[in-house]
Amino acid sequence: KGINKKSHQKLLDFKSVSTKQVNQLSLLSKELCKDIKIKKSLEEKNSTLFKKNMRRNFEANKLFNSYINKFGGRFANESKLETKDINEDFNSLSDLLLTYSTMNTNFKESANKSETFFEGLFKKFASRREDFRLLRANMFGVFRKLSISIGKEYVKKGLIKNSDDIFYLDFEDIDGTIKMDDIDFSKINIRKKEYNFFKTFQPPSHFKVANGIWPSLFDSKVDQSNSGIGASRGKVTGRAVVLEEFSIPEKDSFDILITRRTDPGWTSLMAISKGIVVEHGGILSHASIVARELGIPAVIGIKNACKRFKTGDTIFVDGDKGVVEAISK
């Protein structure tokens, strides 16, 4: 049975854990920055001083630990074990808390509107999909901590130089399957070079092999289409920031976030954006779900957006029609 646009939008309006995270982060940042000494340690990016000041502020420490226990595994590239989490990357954590401390980010959760049984069923399980993503992220965070602990033991034994080197070994190298004397540690440097090489190019999202001929891994064609998927309704014009990787831009330096792809760890950055443009994704990708829930206009599927637009460009985002246009460059 066909479904009209209005019914489609209604179906996609469901609660997820993302709004809860953003609101708790906003509450936490404001509470921490009430304490002058804690705020100063964040501004100086001094993790030692931060921990010291947190120990003397019971309420702030309690709120911080509550957030970390619930959302500690949620950070950019959260499903990549080699990526530092928010407990390790204090600079990013400081930037995030300071940014949120001065912003109005109290988003309301989607209200339960009248709906049919099957609409409610869809929303229930679509929402749980996001819950499971958070559980997965937290589990990856736990596994990273365990891996780093093993890495530190390997460093003490002189087997590897850095604890992070553990991620370039095979699982059999650390679970006891292979004897320590038989592990080939030289593959660490080889795999690091391979890892850095594969970070240097962006292959096409999909390709086909015709008559046994493989296409180039490099996508040389620049698609100039301004049309994508209108993932979240609304219109906005503003300054763009183009991010190849996750980072917290300077306060008030941008309005529209443009990137290749996101994962749930980008939620905190999306929440302080007025518009979102993503090259890859679909109507149920995380960026789409978060944008709808937070009421931020978003267009997904604008090919080569990171090449066509530059940081500082003024662009127009139409989440209703799925169109993105450059106003000035």
Predicted regions and their residues:
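Contiguous hydrophobic, helix-prone segments at protein termini
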Residues: 1-226, 230
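Short, flexible coil/turn micro-motifs enriched in small/turn-prone residues
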Residues: 67-68, 153, 223-225, 229, ...
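Mature hydrolase/peptidase catalytic cores and their serpin-fold inhibitory cores, especially
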Residues: 199-267, 276
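Acidic, glycine-rich flexible loop/linker segments
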Residues: 240-255, 260-262, 266-329
